[in-house]
């Protein structure tokens, strides 16, 4: 069924690409739609905020630590030592029982002159039409499947080459349908391309996403079409699976990537797996494995370059010093990568070993509700 949906998805957009005039009309229509949605939300906020009790939640997240990073057993002084890696501040809440909002800002993110929103992960408004349908607009997470992709960045110690080069936070709009039992959510979303540039801000990406929650098994699946150059697309099939048994969990992701006329499966793909086991309430173990490969001869994949084949693995311990609280922890881990990375600016290197000691905190600073 997933591959049938994917085929329909691809064929539809190839029809648009064959008719440049129609495609331009589509782009113009989406721009006007985004502007209309934003205007309607802005007009609605002052009126609806008075109809119910608004809430505000303020949260703070950070990760600092010490790294020892070596390639061919030679220490890399520019990336080793004490580091402040993440500093995030978020505000979320509701204006009433139908309209909610969320904003997350990276305080330590370098901002480009041509994009003042670079440090903003997301800022959007969500409208709950009924128990099944939600509409959202603003800067959002582009809905690509997979549990590595879905994790908060401060929770990732070892990541795939794909994860290191993707830009998941983009302006767009989405519609989500939740089933009656609440176990599945289906989302359709249109965003800026994950590869948009200052010279091409009007490139787009199209996403269909399924999030399932079935107790021992959870899923984050998607099919995606991402414009990597004007009128040229790369497609993703992302299959994220999570299995929970007692104190153990396994996240297993597979992603296949293909541009037009490429061999469909396994030429350009990634596999990510993470295993977690809670030995006791205040001590946990984790292990991680990633594999990225691109055996195509095109430049369509901007995340895993043609000619790349990289394997990485590692593991460590997590200590929770505050009893019955997982929002503060200390982590010690080690990872190793090997293979060929054809991206000169890539994150993973051949024969690279990293030892990481990290302190993480997710602090809930404020929760307020109007009386």
Regions found by a protein language model. Give the residues of each.
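Outer membrane beta-barrel
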Residues: 51-66, 78-193, 212-213
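Membrane-spanning beta-strand positions in outer-membrane beta-barrel proteins
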Residues: 55-57, 100, 134, 183-185, ...
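Short, well-structured alpha-helical patches and their helix-loop capping segments
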Residues: 160-167, 198-202, 290
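Loop-centered beta-sheet repeat module
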Residues: 187-233
């Amino acid at each position: 069924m997933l591959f049938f949906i994917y085929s329909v998805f691809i064929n539809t957009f190839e029809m648009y690409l064959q008719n440049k005039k129609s495609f331009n009309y589509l782009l113009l229509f989406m721009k006007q739609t985004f502007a209309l949605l934003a205007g309607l939300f802005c007009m609605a906020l002052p009126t609806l905020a008075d109809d119910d009790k608004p809430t505000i939640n303020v949260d703070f997240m950070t990760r600092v630590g010490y790294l020892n990073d070596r390639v061919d057993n030679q220490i890399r002084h520019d990336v080793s030592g004490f580091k402040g890696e993440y500093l995030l501040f978020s505000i979320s809440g509701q204006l009433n029982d139908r309209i909610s909002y969320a904003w997350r800002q990276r305080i330590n993110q370098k901002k480009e002159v041509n994009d003042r929103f670079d440090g903003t992960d997301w800022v959007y408004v969500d409208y709950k039409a009924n128990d099944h349908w939600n509409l959202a607009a603003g800067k959002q997470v582009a809905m690509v499947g997979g549990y590595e992709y879905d994790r908060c960045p401060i929770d990732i110690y070892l990541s795939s080459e794909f994860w290191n080069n993707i830009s998941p936070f983009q302006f767009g709009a989405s519609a989500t349908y939740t089933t009656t039992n609440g176990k599945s959510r289906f989302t359709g979303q249109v965003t800026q391309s994950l590869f948009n540039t200052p010279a091409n801000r009007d490139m787009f990406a199209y996403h269909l996403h399924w999030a399932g929650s079935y107790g021992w098994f959870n899923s984050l699946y998607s099919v995606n079409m991402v414009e990597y150059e004007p009128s040229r697309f790369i497609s993703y099939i992302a299959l994220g699976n999570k299995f929970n048994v007692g104190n153990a969990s396994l996240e297993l992701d597979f992603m296949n990537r293909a541009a037009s006329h490429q061999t469909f499966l396994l030429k350009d793909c990634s596999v990510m797996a993470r295993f977690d086991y809670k030995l006791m309430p205040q001590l946990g173990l984790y292990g991680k494995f990633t594999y990225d490969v691109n055996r195509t001869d095109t430049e369509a994949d901007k995340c895993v370059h043609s000619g790349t084949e990289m394997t990485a693995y590692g593991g460590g311990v997590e200590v929770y010093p505050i009893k019955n609280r997982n929002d503060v922890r200390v982590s010690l881990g080690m990872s190793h990568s090997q293979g060929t990375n054809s991206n000169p600016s890539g994150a993973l290197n051949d024969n690279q070993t990293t030892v990481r000691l990290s302190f993480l905190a997710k602090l809930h600073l404020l929760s307020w509700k109007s009386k």
